[in-house]
Amino acid sequence: MCIRDRVVYDIHENTIQSILQKKWLNPFAKLIAIVGYFILEKLSKLFFHHYILAEDSYKSFIKNNSTVIYNYPIIKDYNHQNVKKEYDLVYIGDITEDRGALIMIKTLLTLKKSIPKINLALIGNVPPILEDALIRSISRNGLDNNIRLFGYMNYYDAMQIVCKSKIGLCLLKPKKNYIESYPTKLFDYMQVGVPFVCSNFPLYDNLLNKCNAGLSIDPLNIKGISSTIIGLFDDSEKYNNLSKNGINALNKEYNWLAQENKLFHLIQSS
């Protein structure tokens, strides 16, 4: 690499926190990985002219020469207004225990007591270490007819399933990497007018205070989650308002267009 070159580096993850959350790494391996990344990060500052950060929280470890550019979705027409709802609940994203896989199963089991035919669409990759346990848990709890595992799908096809769903889920566990980062799935739900139920982290609550497109709840409170979902099913006026608010907020602010302009300006001025 020529030192005279100007390099802009894009950071989309808090890598150290991500390493700490890897359950398949033993403590020694985590320590080696973290120290290695820390050294690499320090050395990178000798070569990188500017950093693009996907979250405000990343400013804590990249304080200078950085610009926050949020990973908002590109607005597309998914014809969501004319789609028949086939799924009561939907989740899009990697399916792991920390991202709420077992929480969603427990919630569905509770909901099934009052809504026997309730169904959940799970869209995303399931790591091999969890896949067998997840399938066994679904079968053991008699939820084979209530949960559909779509696996990994391209973005457009995944959004077609989201369009066919009533309520989006984002019940991430209170891990530091999640608490301080916006999950893009919230904006995916908003784009097609799907109200969502999410974890009650301060960052998420701040978003809800601005756009009023969903509801937040303690992700470890299964009864509370279930009651919140049933409340949305039963209150069509509230449901419709949340749906409209999400679409309006996404179109006005939480889309890629404004971020794209920031990115172009940054690169042109670098």
Predicted regions, residues:
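Acidic donor-binding loop of glycosyltransferase active sites
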Residues: 162-179, 194
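Nucleotide-activated donor-binding/catalytic signature segment of Leloir-type glycosyltransferases, i.e.
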Residues: 124, 132-160
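Conserved donor-binding/catalytic core segment of Leloir-type glycosyltransferases
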Residues: 82-108, 120-122, 243
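Short, small-residue-biased leader/transition segments that mark boundaries at the very start
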Residues: 1-3
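Acidic anion/phosphate-binding donor-loop and adjacent secondary structure
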Residues: 63, 67-68, 72-87, 100
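Conserved acidic donor-binding segment of nucleotide-sugar-dependent glycosyltransferases
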Residues: 210-222, 231-237
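Membrane-proximal helix-turn-helix segments that form the acceptor-binding/catalytic region
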Residues: 9, 15-16, 29-51
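A short, well-ordered alpha-helix in the C-terminal region of glycosyltransferases
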Residues: 224-227, 231, 238-253
